[in-house]
């Protein structure tokens, strides 16, 4: 999920990590085992004078499967379920409105959760910008998981940003 946001003007930083669980400073091994209550997530720092939260939400929706309650693509389990973690009432409102708009557009129930942000724990360094550090491996993973094919099936010709 870092790549689509990294390239956007106004995005200051994108950090892979874990949100929503009860274990302090969890490791990838703990989170991927599914017992911490965390979800794999990205933290996006942005300049609101250069990019809107609504634009970030649009990019988010076009890069996930909002219909899959079991995870994302070939990553299954509650730790891979999609969510938007909000930090204030305005962002909650915008996230819920965007979710409703996506549901209307797709004519389906959207299973992505909109949740209050809890402490964000950065993932280990080898996870940061994995797609840049390991481009061949990332491309292989993305292709074999059917990510691009599934996004095209959901969104049609709309760009995945």
Regions found by a protein language model. Name each.
Residues 1-161:
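Flexible coil/turn and secondary-structure edge motifs
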């Amino acid at each position: 999920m870092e790549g689509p946001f990294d390239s956007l003007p106004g995005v200051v930083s994108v950090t892979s990590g874990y949100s929503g669980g009860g274990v302090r400073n969890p490791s990838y091994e703990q989170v991927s085992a599914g017992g911490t209550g965390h979800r794999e997530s990205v933290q996006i720092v942005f300049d609101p004078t250069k990019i809107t939260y609504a634009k970030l939400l649009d990019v988010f929706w076009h890069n996930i499967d909002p219909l899959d309650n079991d995870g994302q693509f070939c990553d299954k389990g509650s730790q891979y379920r999609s969510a938007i973690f909000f930090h204030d009432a305005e962002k909650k409102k915008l996230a819920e409105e965007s979710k409703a708009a996506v549901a209307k557009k797709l004519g389906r129930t959207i299973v992505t959760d909109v949740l209050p942000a809890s402490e964000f724990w950065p993932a280990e360094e080898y996870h940061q910008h994995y797609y840049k550090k390991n481009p061949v491996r990332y491309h292989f993973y993305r292709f074999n998981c059917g990510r691009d094919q599934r996004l095209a099936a959901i969104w049609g010709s709309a760009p995945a940003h």
